UniProtKB/Swiss-Prot annotation, chain A:
Annotated membrane topology: Peripheral membrane protein
Record lineage: Eukaryota, Fungi, Dikarya, Ascomycota, Saccharomycotina
Subunit and interaction comment: Component of the ER-mitochondria encounter structure (ERMES) or MDM complex, composed of MMM1, MDM10, MDM12 and MDM34. A MMM1 homodimer associates with one molecule of MDM12 on each side in a pairwise head-to-tail manner, and the SMP-LTD domains of MMM1 and MDM12 generate a continuous hydrophobic tunnel for phospholipid trafficking.
Protein name, as recorded: Mitochondrial distribution and morphology protein 12
Gene: MDM12
Keyword Transport: yes
Function text: Component of the ERMES/MDM complex, which serves as a molecular tether to connect the endoplasmic reticulum (ER) and mitochondria. Components of this complex are involved in the control of mitochondrial shape and protein biogenesis, and function in nonvesicular lipid trafficking between the ER and mitochondria. MDM12 is required for the interaction of the ER-resident membrane protein MMM1 and the outer mitochondrial membrane-resident beta-barrel protein MDM10.
Residue span(s) of domain SMP-LTD: 1-232
Compositional bias of kind Basic and acidic residues: 248-264
From Swiss-Prot, chain B:
Transmembrane intervals: none
Domain SMP-LTD: 1-225
Name of the protein in its database record: Mitochondrial distribution and morphology protein 34
Species the sequence originates in: Eremothecium gossypii (strain ATCC 10895 / CBS 109.51 / FGSC 9923 / NRRL Y-1056)
Gene: MDM34
Subunit (UniProt): Component of the ER-mitochondria encounter structure (ERMES) or MDM complex, composed of MMM1, MDM10, MDM12 and MDM34.
Length: 264, 590
């Protein structure tokens, strides 16, 4: 473990969880949601008591792929003296807890005619991967390379699981799962009303959501995809305005992704 | 009560007004075109009863064939009043999301609604003195005839509508299907013409079953289709069938000449080989643990094992993985003990089926990995798994005006494309990786114009030839190119500078995976789909052109048709040991 994370500090400070929740809530509010989802909120957030283990494995020159991508963008590549690439092993088997609530809305025949409250509790997130962090030309690239075998995360199911693997054959091996384990608990129905029932733990739905979530992450952050943080000053005001105009687009894009995934 | 209805909507009169208008439109639309989707305009759970009752009201005249032409209704139906004083309840009892097929949601819902009220008014023709003078003899004709139209206004009020039903709901991406079970419907009818009240009520109640079985589901389905198609009017399927029934159906010839001409002789040969291969008199069971028991055919249940042989982290770093597997085995035994089972209990390990593409921890710890190799493998796996998915490389500007909001800039499609191509270039830049299954790589590309066009053309050619593997059979797509890449001199080159100094196994689809080698399968798993030439167990049918050119060049240039050419196996014709056949070009001049 290369990085010594003083996780206790975080735990002692109770405001950190609150602040993180507030920040994430703010971000969620700023999202432009599709019309059938409203009121998405993070009702609970706990960082947990177990810190991630981050180990620095390698320091090297950045991969050519990054330069290639920059070149294709039309960026001129300057000196490579300060460029550096870290290979890190990220191991997280903590007890982070996220509680989300949202409402599915039917806008027919009148707006906001009918709502279905949904609550999700996400926990037991397990990650053990190699992560590539490259800094070059004032841009930061983050990409998850591959999973690392881990007895705690491999074969999570018990050997007695009756859902036999006999028909797994159709699926090709996934190149990376990134999130090796995740537990999503669902509750459908209003919390406060005593009448009627709340539908809890819809297994198929949980499976579906975790698949969507995993696929999204895999698509966005797993090699050969990556996330690129650009620390360059914007060249001109035009670029900035256009980018801020586009701000809403990616979110809608996300929503479409989601629905596309749901359809697929 | 799972769903929360907007209370304001129900307290507000405007909602009732909206419903009233919709209902009225629907009823009158129905009046004009009997038989078309009845009440397609009425919607929502609230409207369920209305359209139900309304459709039921229409039903008796419709069921009397031909009566609708001389309808007793003399004016349009006016919906006077719709009231929904209490909020309906809709409760999900069970929910099922199926992941495999096109997102299908199945739900069992309980609907309940009470105290609703609908009042409709119309005019009916009710001349009790009507005489059919034309058909009756003169001498019976009375002096007083009043055959003029005599319309009577009628008002019907359905109140105390009470509905409870268990419904099955299916949501697909084409529409919403709904079926009603256990319907419990009750209402009170008040008719302004008391004489007719009992008769109408009886008829309505009799037709309720049909309403819930047939009318409502079709109404809701049609309506939902409009939602899902974003307002495009969908022609009711009933009409389509009527149209098609007008034109006499031409008997269609199955397998006429033209159909047969589509099947290439090579395909036919292959199919017949396949069929005949299944016929065996062998008393021994067919071999286990082989990829193909029939030469050249990959059986469905072996597809997974076949897929496992693609280069990936788990078979590339197989040496180390073996130790890992050993550890896993230990863990498993402990697990079993925990479960109260003896460790010798032969439960098949998942490991043999479910292989995760992970970098073994031991490799990581011993630093015997190479980032570039890993990236190459991952890129290759990505390309194979997702042909059409665009690469996501988001760029987030950190120095924009609002630093708090992560301003995600979606990479433009053009960049995406180039990004993808760049990552395929990666593989070609790494000669040792030799992962490139595309015939694009420079050494073997005989057509120097190169580029994606050539590749596309090549793919088209592949598709043209009847032998192209089906879509869900990704493995075979690679067969020909891999074969094309195969020449031995290339293999020697594979010892790359990157892996120099360390005896790392070669990362090449051509090589047998070490993982499999270490298994020491008695049946010799090396079916060598990848390397028939190297293996030397094949006799490639000599052909004059083949001698002059490299095989790969040949495949690329006029690879219009690939044929299955017989093979000799040198294992005394024992099944289970046969390598699959080579795919080779049948000499057909273009």
């Amino acid at each position: 473990m290369s990085f010594d994370i003083n996780w206790n500090k975080i735990n002692e400070d109770s405001t950190i969880n609150q602040r993180a929740r507030a920040f994430l809530n703010e971000h969620l509010e700023s999202l432009q949601l599709p019309s059938y989802v409203s009121n998405i909120k993070m009702t609970d957030f706990k960082l947990g008591t177990i810190p991630p283990r981050i180990t620095l494995k390698q320091i090297d020159n950045p991969l050519d792929d990054f330069y290639e991508a920059l070149r294709l963008e039309g960026a001129s590549i300057g000196g490579r003296d300060t460029d550096v690439q870290f290979l890190m092993e990220v191991d997280y088997k903590g007890d982070m807890l996220i509680e989300l609530s949202a409402e599915l809305v039917l806008n027919y025949p009148s707006p906001n005619f009918m709502q279905l409250p949904v609550k999700l509790t996400i926990s037991d997130i397990g990650i053990h991967s190699l992560c590539l962090v490259a800094y070059l030309q004032r841009q930061l690239f983050i990409s998850f390379l591959c999973d690392v075998s881990d007895p705690a995360l491999d074969n999570v199911e018990s050997p007695l699981d009756s859902n036999g693997p006999a028909f797994l054959g159709s699926k090709a091996v996934e190149r990376i799962s990134l999130i090796r384990s995740i537990k999503i608990q669902t509750e459908i129905g209003p919390q406060d009303l005593s009448e009627g029932t709340i539908l809890r733990s819809v297994g198929k739905l949980e499976q579906f959501l975790s698949d969507v979530f995993k696929n999204l992450l895999r698509k966005e952050a797993a090699w050969p995809s990556w996330i690129n943080l650009d620390f360059n000053e914007d060249v001109s005001a035009d670029v900035e305005s256009s980018s801020s105009a586009e701000e809403s687009l990616p979110h809608r894009d996300d929503a479409q992704d989601f629905s596309a995934d749901a359809r697929a | 009560m799972s769903f929360i209805f907007n209370r304001e909507t129900f307290e507000d009169n405007s909602f009732n007004e909206v419903l009233r208008e919709k209902l009225m439109r629907a009823l009158n639309l129905h009046d004009r075109t009997v038989g078309s989707s009845s009440g397609a305009m009425t919607t929502g759970t609230g409207a369920v009863e209305c359209s139900g009752a309304a459709a039921a009201g229409q039903r008796p005249p419709r069921s009397k064939g031909g009566f609708s032409k001389v309808d007793i209704l003399k004016s349009g139906i006016i919906v006077k009043k719709v009231e929904f004083p209490t909020i309906p309840k809709l409760e999900i009892l069970d929910l099922d999301v199926s992941i495999q097929s096109k997102s299908l949601i199945k739900g069992i819902c309980k609907v309940s609604c009470r105290d609703a009220m609908v009042q409709i008014t119309t005019e009916i023709e009710s001349n009790l003195l009507l005489l059919h003078v034309n058909s009756s003899p003169k001498f019976t004709t009375p002096k007083l005839i009043s055959n003029d139209s005599f319309t009577v206004p009628i008002t019907m009020t359905f109140d105390k509508l009470h509905l409870e039903a268990i419904t099955n709901i299916f949501v697909k991406n084409t529409g919403v299907g709904i079926s009603f079970n256990d319907v419990n419907l009750d209402f009170r009818l008040q008719c302004s013409i008391k004489l007719l009240q009992s008769s109408i009520e009886k008829r309505l109640k009799a037709s309720m079953e049909e309403v819930f079985k047939d009318v409502l589901p079709s109404v809701i389905f049609n309506m939902s289709q409009r939602w899902f198609t974003h307002g495009e009017t969908v022609v009711p399927t009933v009409d389509k069938s009527m149209v098609s029934s007008d034109t006499p159906v031409q008997p269609r010839m199955i397998l006429d000449e033209s159909d047969l001409s589509d099947l290439s002789p090579a395909n036919m040969l292959r199919l017949s080989t396949l069929v005949s291969s299944r016929q065996t008199l062998c008393l021994n069971p067919t071999a286990v643990d082989t990829i193909s028991t029939i030469p050249g055919c990959l059986e469905r249940q072996n597809l997974h094992r076949f897929n496992l042989r693609f280069p990936s982290l788990y078979n590339y770093y197989s040496n180390k993985e073996q130790q890992g597997a050993h550890n896993n085995e230990k863990n498993r035994v402990e697990h079993l003990k925990l479960w109260g089972r003896s460790s010798s209990n032969p439960i098949p390990t998942r490991a043999s089926f479910k292989v995760e593409n992970t970098l073994p921890k031991e490799v990581l710890d011993s630093n015997s990995y190479d980032v570039r190799v890993i990236t190459a493998i991952q890129t290759k796996m990505y390309e194979r798994a997702s042909n059409d998915v665009v690469l996501r490389r988001r760029k987030i500007k950190m120095r924009s005006r609002k630093p708090s909001k992560a301003n995600k800039d979606a990479v433009s499609p053009a960049q995406n494309d180039s990004g993808t191509s760049s990552c395929s270039n990666v593989a070609s830049e790494l000669p040792h990786a030799s992962l490139q299954a595309n015939p694009q790589s420079d050494e073997i590309d005989p057509a120097p114009e190169g580029g994606p066009n050539a590749e596309d053309a090549y793919k088209e050619e592949l598709e043209d030839s009847g032998l192209r593997a089906p879509q869900d059979f990704p493995a075979l797509e690679n067969v020909t190119p891999v074969l094309a890449q195969l020449p031995n001199q290339q293999r020697s080159r594979l010892g790359s500078p990157l892996s120099a100094g360390r005896p790392t196994p070669l990362l090449s689809p051509l090589d047998d995976s070490h993982w499999l080698l270490q298994k020491r399968d008695p049946q010799d798993l090396r079916t060598t789909l990848y390397s028939p030439i190297r293996n030397g167990r094949f006799y490639v049918m000599p052909q004059p052109q083949l001698d002059t050119k490299e095989a790969s060049a040949f495949l690329l240039e006029n690879g219009k048709r690939f044929g299955f050419v017989g093979l000799l196996n040198n294992h005394n014709l024992k099944w289970g040991n046969d390598p699959p056949p080579p795919y080779r070009e049948v000499s057909i001049t273009q």
